Amino acid sequence: MPKPQQVITWRDKTPDGFRFLPKINQMISHMRRLNNAEMLTEEYCDSIIQFEEKLGMVFLQLHDNFGPKNFDLLANYVEKFPKAIPLAVELRNTEWFNNESVFSKAYQLFETEGVTNILVDTAGRRDLLHMRLTTPNAFIWYVGANYSESD
């Protein structure tokens, strides 16, 4: 977890117009799985807010086994996340995309809360390209792995 002074140092070393898109610490996303993560999230946000005008969007990459059964944890987390900090979420578990009602419920949550859905372009997972925008901003995650023929 970066300390506020470290964030200030990074901010001050970058040119005007530069934007940081920091990933939420894995202690929150993977170890706590968004459960009882309020204090850690507050500490994280207190640090990254020091990016000031250079803060682009914060992204939450969920564990690949964080599926729809954890919807309530996800909803609680994004509903409480500070609205002054733009948030994007990457749903990695395929169960989010296999059922239209689950898919719609997750995206409705994101649209309601102003959370950007991360669009993922991953070799071997072209099925994920069906995802939709949930805010006016696009966050596209290009993931390369051993450069498959489809890349």
Q: Where do the PLM segments sit?
A:
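Residues lining hydrophobic/aromatic ligand-binding pockets adjacent to catalytic sites
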Residues: 1-151
